[in-house]
């Protein structure tokens, strides 16, 4: 499945957070949602990305819900979140179901399947923006989308 484009309907999903609660996309309609997919907790690139979202959280807070999604399990997510004092929730997608629905679970350059680092801005159930995973690039897109 290709990566979802702007204007596409965002697939509804329910996933568990690093704290064991469940989050359902369709229940988050009160403000936009920034949903960023990343490959793996506590790896160099993913740690940088998550810390950028952490550091930009005050800019996002009033404007959007922010969630990171990776295949890591809840215990790994919780340890990663605690280690870096992440101030947003991490969602666990161990079977890559949601990543596949959004089109970000695909073959990579090395010939193996994995997550293509992608951030979506979702407004009223639609993809309002799609950006690279860097927090400072995404934040401006919330107002624009």
Predicted regions: what they are:
Residues 1-145:
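Chalcogenol-based redox active-site neighborhoods
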């Amino acid at each position: 499945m290709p990566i979802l484009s702007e204007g596409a309907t965002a697939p509804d999903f329910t996933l568990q957070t690093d704290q064991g609660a469940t989050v359902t996309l369709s229940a988050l309609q009160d403000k936009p949602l920034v949903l960023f997919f990343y490959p793996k907790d506590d790896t160099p690139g993913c740690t940088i990305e998550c810390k950028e979202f952490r550091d930009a959280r005050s800019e996002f807070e009033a404007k959007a819900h922010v969630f990171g999604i990776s295949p890591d399990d809840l215990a790994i997510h919780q340890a990663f979140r605690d280690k870096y004092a992440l101030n947003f929730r991490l969602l666990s997608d161990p079977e890559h179901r949601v990543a596949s629905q959004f089109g970000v679970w695909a073959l990579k350059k090395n010939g193996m399947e994995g997550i293509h680092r992608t951030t979506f801005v979702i407004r009223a159930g639609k993809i309002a923006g799609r950006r690279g995973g860097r927090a400072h690039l995404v934040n401006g897109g919330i107002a624009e989308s």
